[in-house]
Amino acid sequence: MFEQIVEWIKQNYGDARKIIEIGVGHRIDVAEQISKALPRTEVLVTDTNESLVRSREIGRVRAVTDDVMFPTLNLYEGASLIYSLHPPGEIVQALEKLANRIGADLLVVPISDERHDLPQERWRELVVRGRILGWLLNKRV
């Protein structure tokens, strides 16, 4: 599934200056794949766990400690896409608020088919090859 997300991001954000993953946790491989697929794009990952962020040997991907509930806005400025893989439901509203503030699209990839009560008038399913990969709040795509 994550390979399909990387391919979709490559196809739809090939001209992006910056793409950000929020709540990277232990899974850095998706950001690394995006960085390889889009070598001219800055790929940034954030997490609230400072020791986890400091432990990253991640090549071109930059890792920063930040909390989406109280974001450091200048980190996110210029991003075309913010995405989060399997975020806890309680941060989805903060993700949406941040994306709206900086004018970025937001992709939320929940665990299985969970929707976190996303308002249908603003969010749409991201379907690739007949499979729902996530939920998109977008300005561009």
Question: What are these model-predicted stretches?
Answer:
Residues 1-17:
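S-adenosyl-L-methionine
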Residues 15-27:
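Conserved class I S-adenosyl-L-methionine
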Residues 103-117:
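Conserved beta-strand signature within the Rossmann-like core of class I S-adenosyl-L-methionine
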